[in-house]
Curated annotation (Swiss-Prot):
Described function: One of the primary rRNA binding proteins, it binds directly near the 3'-end of the 23S rRNA, where it nucleates assembly of the 50S subunit.
Subunit-structure text: Part of the 50S ribosomal subunit. Forms a cluster with proteins L14 and L19.
Species: Ralstonia pickettii (strain 12J)
Annotated positions of the N5-methylglutamine modification: Q153
Compositional bias of kind Polar residues: 133-145
The protein's name in its UniProt record: Large ribosomal subunit protein uL3
Keywords: Methylation, Ribonucleoprotein, Ribosomal protein, RNA-binding, rRNA-binding
The keyword RNA-binding is annotated on this UniProt entry: yes
Modification after translation, per record: Methylated by PrmB.
Spans annotated as Disordered: 133-153
PROSITE patterns: RIBOSOMAL_L3
NCBIfam families linked to this entry: L3_bact
InterPro entries: Ribosomal_uL3, Ribosomal_uL3_bac/org-type, Ribosomal_uL3_CS, Transl_B-barrel_sf
Length: 217
């Protein structure tokens, strides 16, 4: 895994190219990610860079976590995240260091992970785009039901994976190969082409794309 940044989704807007083309972009706030720990093979069995992002009141921090952050000399954040890297990459950082938007560049392909917007308990029409039943002509009570969910005594069960009503949204999703359209280093913002899962203010994890294709010469 490559080193990345933890951030927050600000919302969507558009930017215009020199040719006048409109590009829809998602604005991500990726302020300073403060390094809280460097994990090594000798002490932890693997190498990683642990960071925190955002701010949190001291009254909301547990004593073990407060001690962990104090040892690194960093302010408490909303979340702690690890990025597994090789030993050489991990050796470039020390606890207390800041990692910012200069980790990325305009035009770079990235993967963005977020938690989708929760929709609550949803029916099959909303959840899986099922078609509804007939509005009339003999149909009086089953307009939006999914229909049959199985067969008879054989097999006598509902097969796993059957699409039915249930909780929709609020799941972790990763969108791959998004392109960075613009970087605002002063305000620590990334403007990314396209949509990103999650609500405004939701936490996101930005990493270099794992499936990025090299540009042809």
């Amino acid at each position: 895994m490559s080193l990345g940044l933890v951030g927050r989704k600000v919302g969507m807007t558009r930017i215009f190219t020199d040719d006048g083309d409109s590009i829809p972009v998602t604005v991500l706030e990726v302020g300073d990610n403060r390094v809280t720990q460097i994990k090594t093979d000798e002490t932890d069995g693997y190498t990683a860079v642990q960071v925190t992002f955002g701010t949190r009141r001291a009254s909301r921090v547990t004593k073990p976590l407060a001690g962990h952050l104090a040892k690194a000399g960093v302010e408490a954040g909303e979340v702690i995240k690890e990025f597994r890297v090789d030993a050489a990459r991990a050796a470039e950082f020390q606890p207390g260091a800041n990692i910012s938007v200069d980790l990325f560049e305009v035009g770079q392909k990235i993967d963005v992970q977020g938690v989708t917007i929760g929709k609550g308990y949803a029916g099959t029409i909303k959840r899986y785009n099922f078609s509804s039943g007939r509005a009339s002509h003999g149909n009086s009570r089953s307009h939006n039901v999914p229909g049959s969910i199985g067969m008879a005594q054989d097999p006598g069960r509902v097969f796993p994976g059957k699409r039915m009503t249930g909780h929709m949204g609020d799941v972790t999703r990763t969108v791959q190969n998004l392109e960075i359209a613009k970087i605002d280093a002063e305000r620590k913002l990334l403007l990314v082409k396209g949509a990103i899962p999650g609500a405004k203010g939701g936490q996101v994890i930005v990493t270099p794309a794992v499936k990025a294709r090299a540009k042809k010469a």
